[in-house]
Amino acid sequence: MPNITLLKRMLVFLLLNNYFINHFNCVKCKNLNTLCIHNTNLRKTVEVKRKEATKNQIKKEVNKSDKLNVQCSPPQNIYLSDRSEDKYYLNKNKNEIHIIHFGNGLHEKYENLPIENNNYNEIIISKYNTKNKENTEKDLYTKHINKRCYLNGNPINFKILTSLYKWINSKKLHKHIKSKSAKVDKQSPPYMSIYINYGFTKPKLLFINYLSTKYKNNGKNKYLKKYLRKYEELYEKYTYELDEQNDTDVISQNNREPMPNYSIDDFLIQNKNKNYKVTLVYDYISNLHNNEYQNVESVNNFIKNNELFDINEWKKNNKPYLIYKYKYKYKNPINKQIHFYEYDYYVPKLITYEEDISTEPKFVSPNLNSTKCYNNSPINFLTTSGFSSRNIDTFGKERNKIYSFNTPTDVKRNIYFNDLIKISSSYNQHFFHNLNFLLNLYTLQILIRDKTAIETDYIIDKFDQLKDKLIQLNTHNSLKHNNNNTKPSSQKYEERSSQDSGSFINSYYKTDQATPQNADYHYEDVNSPQTFVNFEDNIKLNGKISSDENLKKKENTKNEINDNYDNELDREISRHLTHKKNLFDDKIQIFKNKYNENILEDTDFIKLWKYDQNGEIIEALNQVPVPKIYLNIDAPKYCLWKILQNSGKNAYSEIPTPNRKLEAWRQQVNLKFFYKQNFDTSISLRNISKEELSNFKMKIVESTNQNEKHHSDQYTQINCQEHGKDNTQHDDKNNPNFRNYLNDKKTHKKNAESNILQTDKITYNVSTDEKRETQYDVKGNNPDTETNNEQSTVNKLKEKHKKAFYTLVVRDGIIDEILSDDISILKKLNQELKEKNESNEGKGNDLDATEQRENEQVGPNGEKKTTSKIFVGSFFNIKDPEVEYLINKELYFIPEHTNWYKKNTQPFVRGQIGKQSRKFDNDYPIYDYRKSDFGMAKFSALNLASIKDCAVLYLDKDIDLSDKFFHIIFISTSKNEDENLQNDQSYVVYENIPTDKQSPNLEKKQPSDEIYNEDEDHETSDNLLQNDQATNSNVEINHQDDKGNEPNSITNNIQKNNNYKKNEITNSIHNPITNPRLVLYIKENSKINIHESHISLNNNNGGMVNALSRIYLEQNSKVNHILSQELGKSAWYFHNVSVQNGINSNYKFVDILLGSLSSRVNLQIEGSQGSKQQSYGLSLLEGKQNISQYEMFHHEHSSMQTDQLFKSLVSDTAHSVWRSRGRIERNAIKAKLNTLCRSVLLNLGASAVAIPTLEIIPSDIEEANHGATISDLEEEPIFSLMSRGIDTNIARRIMMKAFVNEILEHVPDENLKNKVYQKIFKFSQKYKDESKKILRMTNL
């Protein structure tokens, strides 16, 4: 082989190598400057130089042509392709390698050219240096016309092209071009009009690309569609198009490579911890508007120290961001004037998808080091912490939009991962709305974090060590206190003065504490060391004690100082556990070292408030007054780490996660909207009076008058009129009792008002009392417009009504002792029960001795313990050790999680449940994956994690309270209820977008095209403040210093250069999450009635109520449990009711569901031998409500009986779901199980789903039935009523009342019944027009 051919082939081989091309690029084409390179990798570095070279060459040619005034020939060394960046070189030198690439159909296109003799071959190549010239011409035409040709010869003969150019510029061709072809681009060179006008494929000169795969350009982003994964199929639809092709090349190159399984720590190590300093900030900022302990002046300083991103860098990159503006009023407790404060902070805005695209299940590889993250999903690093690395499955293309613990609003992977790391999990409530219920919103954020489980376990261990240390201190102090009773007073004082720490179990909210005062009624700082020094100096100067009276006074003052000091230490401990939230991540080592030291020595957060004897704040460092009940939140007994010493901290390790076969959540059609809610902790801090709860408290008809009430109800059902008034009220118009009622009306009002002012110190409007009284009418009418007899009948009914024996009010998950009834009622009842017990046992001779002996029992450490027969109140007020142990054991019960570890409850995954599983009795599951009806384990875990308090009702054995009702009211408030926050500037979120770009997912509620300027916002806010000042007489505007406005000045300077559009997203919308919990423990042979109510005082309230009720019955006990739900129309309600029924016990459950946007009640009953359980439910739906109820009755033992009935009235476009599951195990012989659901659809838009199931294993059962019906109102009864002269509207109302009365028979509360009837009246009024249309059609 000759050397020339060898050199040529070696040259081709070297050029095919990327490394050689890179070296070739480095030497800037000095030796091979005539090569035409078409390589994406090389274009990234050479593109700028090519553009400059081509522009210079074109300018030179244009200048020459302008000077000569002659049409120049096209440059012989440049060809332009269809894209601006594809510019290629051709050299004038001969004997070099040249590349020419024409599109398909070249022969046909050149035949149409006006060239003499059709000499198109000369256009392609003029000369050839090969031996057989004729053969090469034939091969060129026959074989290589549709391929990329690589030839070695002379350059193209441009003489023919110039002749063509001159001919094209003629008049005839210009007319031909204008009529048939497109216009020529002005920027393109003249000779390119040949390709443009005749539709030729422009030359795409690809260098040494003959052996590679062909490239097909689809006209769009070529690499995205080819290389994006399935979960990024919506990339082009929901993202802006990239301008430069280089960016798409980078993206496609990253997407081709699979993402490695590395944790956050690995990522941060690779990036040298640059981004780690601004990561994982707690939700402290988002809760500033509702924080009780934050000083107003330090807000701006906190924002500066915890900025999530640099605004300068963010705006240089033209990225969108959010502005959170808060403005609230607070009353200064010293001068009694109203002050204003407004602040804002900035949060980066990430681009998210609108639809759920997580179609593939996420799994964790076995070799993954971190237990807090998932494969190929960097977003899960921040959202799924706190739970184990179990396989989290989704439902598929459609079902995953319903229930998925991953990210339905999925953030783009790889590209924005650096920005994603900068976001704290607390801000996921603004970006990743589907995982709000997994986030810890209160003190347990230390446990559910974005780090590994090692640090979490370390913190829990430190909690345990701290508790042991405090217990030792407590026992040591208690022993000293007992020894001091036998020591002289001087020795007592010396020992007390040497103590540096206090008791841990002192009750925090004893408001009757005495504190030292000065003559001017100003309190001294009991924690300052000067008070101790001065006190000791006085003792040393006096020497001996003059008299016993002075000694007692000094001892009392010193005891008060020590008690207050102990309380301050307790507060300081709680603040170390809950307040220093910003020291967990970026300063984790300092946080750990803090626990290694003696925590009692640090006194940074001791000074909080100073109180008077009534518990009112007279001086506060934070200058924000808080109601007395909310002062208990950070008390030592309210710290959650005390609860987590048992199984509570293990509840997060192996919680079962529902998989794609879960059937219960399929019917929950509106959960996708739930994922997009912005939940927070913005509860209301306003004062709530007892008068506001009068319409929600129980009104029970006495047993002697039940028959009269029953007859009156029957009479009202028949004699109804269209306007909703009862005929029975017209018969008593001349009743003389009404005159007496009118005469005594004013006196009753004054007496009631004075009593409330004396007892509760709360003023209210008399008109509100009248409105509350008027709501006893069944039809919801106003008695003021009625006649005299109507007022008298209402007055009579009032006299017959009685209230609940005791009402316990729980406000936002915390027991409110002010709104609850007086605790002396329970103490009196407890004493009566003890006396009755003593009399029954024959030990009632000396009641004083027995009372003292039982109420005061000395423990092993010398502390006093008390026993109780009944307890109703907060879990943290329990003093009986037996009660605390029993309640504490049930406090950590989580449905599904606790049952998961039962015997024979492992999931069965070998096939369909039924055929194969019955071959293996030991492996038969109870709560298996495939038929798990609830899927509420994570909601229950969140309830335990975010618990602040727990309502407890304990009843000792052999106590019959079946004639008494205990009413427990759970109130969920919202920041929207506050009167001082009803302006538009209280809580506003703005989205700032660069003017040259648009956000892909912009949800504009109130769009504005104005350019954002913060100065204008401050001016408008100042105007609003001035307007508020005019309305409030004693209002003082508190303007901040220049230091507090430094962040605003920085952003103003930035926004002068970069213009952003401001779009308002939310305005004064607060959606708080509350987690109420109720524990009932009824011992053997006891009976009780419980009414549990969940209410909202404002019907417009939203948010989420995540409740859990645990009920435990011992043998031969009986419980009647009534549950009512009357939340706001925008609230989300999730409630787990878990019941353990004892041997031969009877549990009756009645639930009435009226309010909320979406409600979900899960009832799980575990029975015992001979137990009986009953369930009666009623739901009334209107609008777009979605109410669902899931019930599980588990028969594990013999002779169990279950009766279930659920009814629902569905109106408008509401949706009702009912799912029942009854399971009878092999040993549960002689069982009785009956379930039935009846749903009535009132119009065409309503819908309902009913799924009853029975799982029966034994053959020896007495009875098992299940059924469900979904229908409209029956027409025949309505027609029979209409034939008797009753209007259609009233006839439908009578039918609906008859439908619900079967459930209301089990409800003794008249207020609740009236609300059901009022809603039925609304249903009947909606069909007034439809009935007339039907009559018109019949008449025609």
Swiss-Prot record:
Extract one GO cellular component term from the record. Answer: apicoplast
- The entry's keywords: 4Fe-4S, Apicoplast, Iron, Iron-sulfur, Metal-binding, Plastid
Q: Where in the cell is it found?
A: Plastid, Apicoplast
Low complexity bias locations: 477-487
* Biased segments, Basic and acidic residues type: 723-734
Q: What InterPro entries does this protein's entry cite?
A: Fe-S_cluster_assembly_SufBD, SUF_FeS_clus_asmbl_SufBD_core, SUF_FeS_clus_asmbl_SufBD_sf
Q: What happens without the gene?
A: Repeated attempts to isolate gene deletion mutant failed, suggesting an essential role of the gene during asexual blood stage growth.
| Molecular-function annotations in GO | 4 iron, 4 sulfur cluster binding; metal ion binding
Bias (Polar residues) occurs at 782-794, 1022-1037
Instruction: Extract the Pfam families matched here.
Output: SUFBD_core
Is 4Fe-4S one of the keywords? Answer: yes
The reply to whether Cytoplasm figures as a keyword in the UniProt entry is no
- Chief localization: plastid
Q: In which pathway does it act?
A: Cofactor biosynthesis; iron-sulfur cluster biosynthesis
Positions of region (Disordered): 477-498, 723-743, 765-794, 835-865, 992-1055
**An annotated GO BP:** iron-sulfur cluster assembly
What is the protein's known function?
Participates in the sulfur mobilization (SUF) pathway for iron-sulfur (Fe-S) cluster biogenesis. As part of a complex consisting of SufB-SufC(2)-SufD, involved in assembly of [4Fe-4S] clusters. Enhances the ATPase activity of SufC.
Q: How does it assemble?
A: Component of a complex composed of SufB, SufC and SufD in a stoichiometric ratio of 1:2:1. Interacts with SufB. Interacts with SufC; the interaction enhances the ATPase activity of SufC.
Record-stated family: Belongs to the iron-sulfur cluster assembly SufBD family.
Question: What protein name is recorded for this chain?
Answer: Iron-sulfur cluster assembly protein SufD
Originating species:
Plasmodium berghei (strain Anka)
| Gene of this entry | SufD
